[in-house]
Amino acid sequence: MGTLRFFEEVVSFKIRRTFGFADYKRHLPPYAGGGVFLTFTKRVRNAPNEIQMKKLHHIVLVLALAATLFTGCTKDEGVTPRPPVPETADQTIMFYLTGTNLGSYFRKNVDDAMNAIDRNILHNSRVLVFIQPQRGLSMVLELYYTPRNDDYVPGAQFSYEHCKVDTLRRWADADFNSMDGGTITEVISYMAEQAPARRYGLILGGHGLGWVPDGTSVNAIRFSAFQDFWSPMPNALPTRWMGDSGKRAEIPQLAAAFGNTGLHFDYLLFDACFMSSIEALYDLRGCADHIIASPCEVMAAGFNYTDILPHLLADAGTSYDLPGVCSEYHDYYMNRATTKSGCIALTVTGELEPLAAIVKEIETKYPGQTYDRASLQTYEGLDEHVFYDLQGYIEAICDEKDPLLDKFRAQMGKTFPTESRLHTPSFYSVYGLGDAPNGMHTIEDGKYSGVTTSAPCERFAPEWAQTSWYRATH
């Protein structure tokens, strides 16, 4: 065998300690049987000698066999036996993390959630995660708490003293499309069947573009222009819009998929870009009582679940603190994150129809009103903007002395509670980096309402006129 110039194999934590090889890349473990089997991908250049290589091959074979046996375990045969699950949980929180090119960030999200659960915050509630660790493989996991710590590996990712992972279901299908409406319904329904609860919360992580239709639904003549329009600038930092092209669910399809589950969520939390869009929120108003979302891009790291999850499992898991979630998100990006870009808002969906009724009065009274579009706050770096501040737009078209404007502002306070409309002084956008230092765009004082509209946008005017929000307000 001599010197082997390149050797890559899946090895366990113990091999690292035995051989001292460097350059390990952690991968999401193949969760199974109530425990966590930690794996690492290792690259070894110029392996020391044939004897060591034989020893390495021997250990790898043993580990491969162990992994085979491990993934074949029943729940009762896992390394750390599961405690009994409640017949009906106080709350089931579902993570729906879709796509593979945010994989490392999703793995960090899962790790952070485990870190929170390790502190014994679940009580009578449950947390399930849908994730796609690689193309062609999708799975539903459950994160649970146990007093046992049989398989704890100090310092290793996905290994905690008391939070463990169980694989409930796998899909090994290269054609599996997690953003197909039928698939969304199937997966969420499955999670609800496995973890029935008195109330449900849903966290959606992935790529978002607000209400804007998928490029494939724009007519063929405009398709390439649509793609070019949303192309990120060179050297852009990763956000939760970039990637997994061709696999998107438009908002009406998403709302229908949620509705087909028969569930009504207490809250939706969008860990995705541009989802605090009035057009998108209005489509989703029947799916949940509250929606947490950002009007601009969300950095690829997303929400900091180590600190967020305790707010979602308040009062021993029997309730949730959504304003606390917004505050925690804002605090993280304001004070701890490298890129200080964090804008967030909480929507009370039951107040969206009264808001639409007031906006209709204003739009009817001021049809075709001229205004300075350039003076409005926007939430991306595009030369031709798509997402404008909703309150700024209405204030621009409505006379300042009109009582309708006071009525609108009062209703905005009910629909988007002021204490949960939070923002950093500027936001990051992968679009139009040449126009702003380091991709950062300033939010002007007094111009942030936490929700966008595309009413002033001309590029997508025909599509915008087909939205439910347009029909409700015109």
Model-identified regions with their sequence ranges:
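Targeting/processing segments of secretory and organellar proteins
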Residues: F7, A22, G33-V36
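Sec-dependent bacterial lipoprotein signal peptides
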Residues: K25, V44-T71
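Bacterial Sec-dependent N-terminal signal peptides
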Residues: M53-K55, A67-D90, A455-C457
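N-terminal module-boundary/linker segments of secreted carbohydrate-active enzymes
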Residues: D76-L122
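Loop/turn elements at helix/coil->beta-strand transitions in domains of secreted/extracellular proteins
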Residues: A89-T92, L122-V127, A195-G201, G262-Y267, ...
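Second-shell loop/turn segments in exported
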Residues: Y96-G103, R170-S178, W241-S245, L268-F270
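Catalytic-core segments of thiol-dependent peptidases
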Residues: Q132-R135, M139, L143-K164, D175-T261, ...
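Terminal, contiguous helix-loop blocks that mediate binding/assembly
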Residues: Q227-H474
